Structures are given as C-alpha cells and as structure tokens.
Amino acid sequence: MQVVLRQAIPGLGKPGEIVNVKPGYARNYLFPRQMAVRVTPGILKEQQVRLEQEAARKLAERQQAENYKTALETIGRFVIRKKVGEHDLLFGQVTTSDIAEVVLATSGLDIDRRNILLNEEIKKTGVYPVQVKLHPEVTATLRIQVTPE
C-alpha cells in the first residue's frame, strides 16, 4: 500500500515522501497516529506541484549563491587592520567573526561566521585565501589582507 508520510519516520522516510508499506502497518500504526495518509490521485498531483516548487526554490537559492560568489570575488581583497607586535605577529589572531564583519562592511553581504573556513590560523600580516560556503554546492574564495593598525 502506498502512503504519504506526514512526519519523519526513522527507517521509512521524510515528510512528504511516498512510500510502500504493508496494509496492516498503515492501518494499525501510521493512520491512527496521523503519521501518514493514503495516496490518492489528488494527493499525487499536490505532491508533484510541491516537488516542482521545491526544485524551483532550490534552483533560485543556488543562483543567488552564484551571484553572491561573483560579487565577493570581484571585490578583490578584504582588508583587516589589527595591532601588530614584533616580526609582524598579531596580538591575538584574525577570527571568522572578524572576517564576517569586514565582508558585511565592504560588500553588505551578511555571512554566518560558521560558513567561513580558514585553512590556517591567521597570526601574521599578509594576504590569506579564505573559503566561504555560500550554499552546499557553491563556495567562494576570498583574499583577506591583514595590515597593521
């Protein structure tokens, strides 16, 4: 018997998925607990429309991430000013929060600091490449320039 899940069920599927289950399982467990409904032609059409809308939304998100990537990479360098001691060593280090603030101030794009990936700790002045994950499939590479105050 085919049913549409209303909520996530471990080992069976996610909400909105159409799955095959045994009739007894559907009648005695899923239907009484309102975890699933029987598949009808109307529900199939509704499901198809929902899937198309979801695909369009994901495509729009990816396109927007590509636009942000292009905008960020055309800026060139993002400059961060920090206090410096001997041998161009910073007092402290450049954090992902610092990078997010500079990107917001320079480009107006608010990036979550958890999406910024540092290959190495930034403890000296210089230019460093930094990866920013804008979308699960889109990653931008920024150039961060650390200069003395």
Curated annotation (Swiss-Prot):
Source superkingdom: Bacteria
**Which UniProt keywords are present, listed alphabetically?**
Ribonucleoprotein, Ribosomal protein, RNA-binding, rRNA-binding
GO BP annotations, alphabetical order: translation
InterPro entries per record = Ribosomal_bL9, Ribosomal_bL9/RNase_H1_N, Ribosomal_bL9_bac/chp, Ribosomal_bL9_C, Ribosomal_bL9_C_sf, Ribosomal_bL9_N, Ribosomal_bL9_N_sf
Which GO molecular function annotations are given, in alphabetical order?
rRNA binding; structural constituent of ribosome
Transmembrane residues, as ranges?
A: none
One GO cellular component from the entry? ribosome
This protein's name: Large ribosomal subunit protein bL9
Which species expresses this protein natively?
Synechococcus sp. (strain JA-2-3B'a(2-13))
